[in-house]
Amino acid sequence: SLVFDQLNQGISLLHIQDINTLELEDFGKTGNYIERQVSRWTKQYFDSETEKIDSMHKLIEWLPKRIPKQKYVSIVHGDYRLDNVVFDNNDNNIAILDWELSTIGDPLADFGYHCLLWHIAKIDNDVAKGLGIPNEDEYLKKYLSRTKMQLDSDWEFYIIFSLFKVAGICQGILGRVRDGTAAS
């Protein structure tokens, strides 16, 4: 569908912007993005931990040992998904919302988070195809073509890392609810 093509185009355009030309060198650190993110979400997880979940502790131990070498540096949105994009009446992407997690980092990690739709929601491929929703492989290939980036065998890591990030966010919310400090 045009909506998914526009989503793909939006994140692709974001990731190919030259941070130096845009004078955004100070918007964030350029290296070790995933290491910093793993540290951030691990800290949030432990600070908010409500009960010990062995599989989460194993993942926290596993992640730092498997981080791929960062090949690209770009603006990353941090929460690029369908409900953070505004479309006009013709399904054109006209605005990207919710920038509080944005920084400079690894665009492939950002795109992995964006693709969690295919991993969290069980999508029947025939139904999705009928609605014009591409499968993940088609969507990823279009992104790589648009950005001229290459992805070796690290895609699974980016998805696992993104699921970990979601777990860290959810645990942080749960901790704030427990502590009575949740905003809503």
Residue locations for each model-derived region?
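Short, polar/flexible loop-turn hinges at active-site or ligand-entry regions and domain interfaces
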Residues: 1, 21-27, 121-128, 150-151
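A cross-family kinase active-site recognition segment
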Residues: 1-57, 67-74, 101-105, 181-182
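An acidic site on a long C-lobe helix of protein kinase domains
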Residues: 3-7, 52-55, 79, 107-110, ...
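Residues at helix-coil transition
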Residues: 9-20, 65-68, 87, 116, ...
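Active-site acidic catalytic loop and adjacent metal/ATP-binding pocket
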Residues: 14, 58-110, 115
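All-alpha amphipathic helical-bundle segments outside canonical DNA-binding/catalytic cores
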Residues: 28-29, 150-162
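Membrane-helix interface segments
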Residues: 52, 70-71, 92, 150-154
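Active-site activation/catalytic loop segments of kinase-like enzymes and analogous catalytic loops
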Residues: 108-147, 162-179
